[in-house]
Amino acid sequence: MTVYNFNAGPAILPPSVLSQAQEELRDFAGTGISVMETSHRAKEFEAVNNEVEARFKALLGIESGYRVLLLQGGASTQFAMIPMNFLGADQVADYIITGTWAEKARDEAQKIGKVHIAATTEAENHNRIPSQTELQFSENPVYVHLTTNNTIYGTQWQSTPETNGVPIVADMSSDIFSRPFDASKFGLVYAGAQKNLGPSGVTVVLIREDWLDKGAKNVPTMLRYSTHAKNNSLYNTPPTFGVYMLNLVLAWIQEQGGLAGMAEYNTRKANVVYNAIDNSGGFYRGHAVADSRSQMNVTFNLPTQELEKQFLAEAKAQGMIGLPGHRSVGGVRASIYNAMSIEGVEALASFMAHFAAKQG
């Protein structure tokens, strides 16, 4: 039986990447040892480390002005690290609240400095993305923080908002490299790797080089971006296997036609599942309003909790795992990140149609 992995993260990885990692597991780059045994100072690993930054920039079409850092601690550490470095005592940062992870980022920033809420969709249980006209920025924010995709609620920014020239800081953990984006609008982008870029354990940061000089100097060494930039992300021992896997995934994305190719593929996949919802006669109810729907996380409910439990049990029995929704929304969540195949979403849509038909 084929198993389709709809987990929200750690999530599905490209089968070809797993096969390559399997082949090289005991002999990395002709060394005769595993990458997990290789010194992070070895030239073979440093080559991988450098390849990651080169591939990352190539996919975005940028040659200079930015650094790619490979950190640890997940996006949750970034929630605090960003304001520690860039939110001064007499400054304000604007936060747009579209879900749980944006709330967590705001909470950490409030411990460090002044935070202004530019918009929030909390009253609607975060079922949509605020419109441009709803955004009320403070007079002179040092940055505007947003979460580009909301895994729990199944919403996603369809375009980058205008911020009057203020740099955007974005948590892209769940949709990074699922589509192109204009790096010039961002001062800093961060993402845990475990949804679209590889296994858990690596946090990727794209940061403008001029921001490296702006960082506070009284921040502990490991929490300064400049520390990691100066040391090529090798200040301390990195998660070498995670970095190696990240490099393989980036190469795979390039092979799929880059970010434009991924965007086209992800749109096709998402449409398959959303069509199953929209054509169900109301049996399936999407949580997100139509113009805020995520292409990465499709969230929906059934008429009763009992039917939801039955749906999840039968889907699992047919090889579709990781579908239970987050407790904040309940129901079903299908995470269809870059590596999810079109066959996977078609299997889910077919199951959805048959399940609804059985209920009469």
Swiss-Prot record:
How the cofactor is bound: the record states: Binds 1 pyridoxal phosphate per subunit.
Looking up Gene3D superfamilies in the UniProt record yields: Aspartate Aminotransferase, domain 1, Type I PLP-dependent aspartate aminotransferase-like (Major domain)
Which EC class heads this enzyme's classification?
transferase
A Gene Ontology biological process in which this protein takes part is: pyridoxine biosynthetic process
Task: Return the InterPro entries for the record.
Answer: Aminotrans_V_dom, Aminotrans_V_PyrdxlP_BS, Pser_aminoTfrase, PyrdxlP-dep_Trfase, PyrdxlP-dep_Trfase_major, PyrdxlP-dep_Trfase_small
Annotated GO CC locations: cytoplasm
Keywords on record: Amino-acid biosynthesis, Aminotransferase, Cytoplasm, Pyridoxal phosphate, Pyridoxine biosynthesis, Serine biosynthesis, Transferase
Q: Which GO terms describe its molecular function?
A: O-phospho-L-serine:2-oxoglutarate aminotransferase activity; pyridoxal phosphate binding
Residues bound to L-glutamate are 41
The UniProt entry, under HAMAP family, shows: SerC_aminotrans_5
Q: What is this protein called?
A: Phosphoserine aminotransferase
Q: In which organism is this protein found?
A: Herpetosiphon aurantiacus (strain ATCC 23779 / DSM 785 / 114-95)
Q: Identify the taxonomic lineage of the organism of origin.
A: Bacteria, Bacillati, Chloroflexota, Chloroflexia, Herpetosiphonales
